[in-house]
Amino acid sequence: MRPKEQVQSGAGDGTGSGDPAAGTPTTQPAVGPAPEPSAEPKPAPAQGTGSGQKSGSRTKTGSFCRSMIIGDSDAPWTRYVFQGPYGPRATGLGTGKAEGIWKTPAAYIGRRPGVSGPERAAFIRELQEALCPNPPPTKKITEDDVKVMLYLLEEKERDLNTAARIGQSLVKQNSVLMEENNKLETMLGSAREEILHLRKQVNLRDDLLQLYSDSDDDDDEEDEEDEEEGEEEEREGQRDQDQQHDHPYGAPKPHPKAETAHRCPQLETLQQKLRLLEEENDHLREEASHLDNLEDEEQMLILECVEQFSEASQQMAELSEVLVLRLEGYERQQKEITQLQAEITKLQQRCQSYGAQTEKLQQMLASEKGIHSESLRAGSYMQDYGSRPRDRQEDGKSHRQRSSMPAGSVTHYGYSVPLDALPSFPETLAEELRTSLRKFITDPAYFMERRDTHCREGRKKEQRAMPPPPAQDLKPPEDFEAPEELVPEEELGAIEEVGTAEDGQAEENEQASEETEAWEEVEPEVDETTRMNVVVSALEASGLGPSHLDMKYVLQQLSNWQDAHSKRQQKQKVVPKDSPTPQQQTNMGGGILEQQPRVPTQDSQRLEEDRATHSPSAREEEGPSGAT
């Protein structure tokens, strides 16, 4: 049995299995003779590097010793015994301890009966001391060793990553090379096929050339043979002639074809081949001539195509130049079109402005026409209204005639007929006087102004109700020429306003002069009438009544007022019909002119007060004035 089995059985069967010396025996250095100089171990190359490397080498040698001891084969065992752990022979092999091991190893291993466990353990200890006199010391692993190992592992990982990358790149390169190799193989196969095809063609051509050369040689040989045959026939003919001279005439002649057939048995086959080859040669020559003609035609066609291509290129160059010129013209036309479009837009804007102006002018013309028609209506109304003062004038004349009667009769009538007999006479007379004064004192121009304002409001409503004309119908005529410089609407309106203002100022001045003349004529009469009104009001307030008034004086004042009013109406009629009245002028000017402020006098104030007091509402409230 091997020492390995003995060690295992000793470790398991012996009583000292728990002894540390038995499991891990401490080997003491064996004292023995000094080794020979030849047997000294050579220094290991790793001993000079440091203590760490020394310890590593020792652990490696210890593990090597264990592996050699526990090994299964006998070869490492014998090598270990005779060479030692470091190469030379062990130091304890010459002593008496291990002297009998090599003679009877079975007695020490445990094959002999009666060997106990302690003896086996002692044997193992002695064997270990003899074989490993200097066992390597055990070393503890430190953090530095761990860091070094981790650093080495990281380096290994990096190396592996780089190797993997290199392998991937190599795989890619290999795939690319494989593809290229496949392509090259396909190209090689196609090249080989082409080579075979070319070889076949070359062989065929060689055969044809050989046949052609053979046919030429055969022709030469046949010519030579024909010449020789002709010479021989001539010779034979001469011989026959000689023989005929020698022989009788009836002797048969020998057949020459039999002799030639006997001499050349393959002549017919060769002649047939020669004919076939000649026919093929003629056919090939015809094909060659035909191919030459075709090549010439192709050359001519190529030349024609080249000429046509050159002509087409020239035409393309010319067309490109024409195209460039047309593009330039097109760009120019585009610019002109844009300019014309801008001008068209400007003209359209001008047309729109002109249309708006024409619309405004049409509206103004319509308004002027309406104003003119209204002025004509007002003129006719004024004429109708002027006929009324004539009637009033006639009434005034009748009143004057009545007033021209002698006063004595009146007084006599007054004295003869007492006032108490006519109780309602003073009241009716006072009422008639008040109504007549109201009619004559009130200015008729007030009613004209009210009528004109009403007409204007109606005209404005009609203009608002009428729809504006469409913008499409407002087209300028064909012969319409736009002015070079248009006058703005603001300036045009300002000019019109200045003109109307000047006309209105002149009209106002004329109207003011007429009104002053009329008031100069009317003022004394108004003063008298107001005086009479004051007297009447005073008498009514005192309770005396209007019976104490002088009727002659009242009627005379009334006739004077009617005469003044008729004169005023005659002055208005004297104005020519074509010249518009101040009211019409104000209407045509686009508005009502401001009237000149009258100078406020005491008489005018009294007239205004009388108008206010004698208004219809006051009349309704007061009732008949004679009721007081």
From Swiss-Prot:
Biased composition (Basic and acidic residues): 236-248, 387-398, 451-464, 605-622
Inactivation phenotype: Depressed postnatal feeding behavior leading to premature death latest at P9. Degeneration in hypothalamic regions that control feeding behavior.
Coiled coil: 168-301, 327-367
GO molecular-function terms, A-Z: brain-derived neurotrophic factor binding; transmembrane transporter binding
InterPro entries found in the cross-reference section: HAP1_N, Intracell_Traff-Reg
Biased composition, class Acidic residues, residue ranges: 214-235, 479-494, 504-527
Disordered: region residues: 1-62, 212-264, 372-411, 451-529, 562-628
Cytoplasm found in the keyword field: yes
Residue ranges, annotated region (Sufficient for interaction with KIF5B): 152-319
Region ranges (Interaction with TBP): 157-261, 473-582
Compartment(s) of residence: Cytoplasm; Presynapse; Cytoplasm, Cytoskeleton; Cell projection, Dendritic spine
UniProtKB keywords: Autophagy, Cell projection, Cilium biogenesis/degradation, Coiled coil, Cytoplasm, Cytoplasmic vesicle, Cytoskeleton, Endoplasmic reticulum, Endosome, Exocytosis, Lysosome, Mitochondrion, Nucleus, Phosphoprotein, Protein transport, Synapse, Transport
Pfam family membership, one: HAP1_N
Major place of residence: cytoplasm
GO cellular component: autophagosome; axon cytoplasm; centriole; centrosome; cytoplasmic vesicle; cytosol; dendritic spine; early endosome
Protein transport recorded as keyword: yes
PANTHER family according to UniProt: HUNTINGTIN-ASSOCIATED PROTEIN 1 (PTHR15751:SF14), TRAFFICKING KINESIN-BINDING PROTEIN (PTHR15751)
Subunit (UniProt): Self-associates. Interacts with HTT/huntingtin; enhanced by an expanded polyglutamine repeat within HTT. Isoform A interacts with ITPR1 and APP. Isoform A interacts with AR; decreased by an expanded polyglutamine repeat within AR.
Physiological role: Originally identified as neuronal protein that specifically associates with HTT/huntingtin and the binding is enhanced by an expanded polyglutamine repeat within HTT possibly affecting HAP1 interaction properties. Both HTT and HAP1 are involved in intracellular trafficking and HAP1 is proposed to link HTT to motor proteins and/or transport cargos. Seems to play a role in vesicular transport within neurons and axons such as from early endosomes to late endocytic compartments and to promote neurite outgrowth.
Protein name: Huntingtin-associated protein 1
Organism: Mus musculus (Mouse)
Taxonomic lineage: Eukaryota, Metazoa, Chordata, Craniata, Vertebrata
